């Protein structure tokens, strides 16, 4: 395991062999560097807990606390983080302070238990794509891929909340960013608790 974290808060000792920190602060864009750091930390804590579960009688896994304040970023890197979160035997509790927007929003709702500060803001919108100045075939392929990842995103969001497909589709048709506060987050089961 590397101890040189690229984007995540370095004040915590995530790789302490006796007592690794269980607080991850994601106050950055979702990109390859932040995804690498988060995946490495979650994997290390799971290995630590697996070892202790096998060797320490009545060992109980303590949750990982993931604090999120992010405008989002790369969908593919976000999906990588979510994949590791979903397969983590150690529970991951997500906390939103500030904002969880776009891919940051989907990472937040993918926590095993979710807390939202009363002043936080969530935002859902249609996946954004970079303009491509290329052949028509390439443009079509890019559109198809954007539709596919939007469908994956929406299915995850619908599975984790009480939001309805029509609400998401209406938001996309109206071409607006859908902002939600903590009260709406409770209404749609985006969060389990407001703190």
Model-flagged regions — what are they?
Residues 1-195:
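Terminal-region recognition feature
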């Amino acid at each position: 395991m590397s101890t040189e974290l690229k984007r995540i808060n370095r004040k915590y000792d995530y790789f302490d062999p006796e007592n690794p920190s269980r607080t991850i602060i994601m106050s950055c864009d979702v990109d390859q560097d932040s995804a690498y750091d988060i995946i490495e930390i979650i994997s290390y804590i799971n290995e630590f807990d697996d070892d202790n579960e096998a060797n320490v009688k009545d060992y109980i896994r303590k949750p990982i606390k993931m604090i999120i304040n992010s405008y989002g970023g790369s969908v593919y890197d976000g999906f990588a983080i979510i994949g590791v979160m979903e397969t983590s035997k150690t529970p991951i509790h997500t906390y939103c302070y500030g904002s969880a927007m776009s891919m940051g929003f989907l990472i937040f709702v993918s926590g095993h238990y979710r807390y939202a500060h009363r002043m936080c803001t969530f935002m859902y919108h249609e996946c954004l794509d970079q303009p491509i100045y290329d052949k028509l075939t390439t443009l079509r392929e890019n559109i198809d891929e954007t539709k596919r990842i939007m469908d994956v995103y929406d299915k995850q969001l619908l599975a984790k909340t009480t939001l309805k497909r029509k609400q998401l589709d209406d938001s996309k048709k109206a071409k607006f960013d859908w902002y939600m506060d903590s009260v709406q987050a409770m209404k749609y089961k985006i969060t389990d608790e407001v703190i």
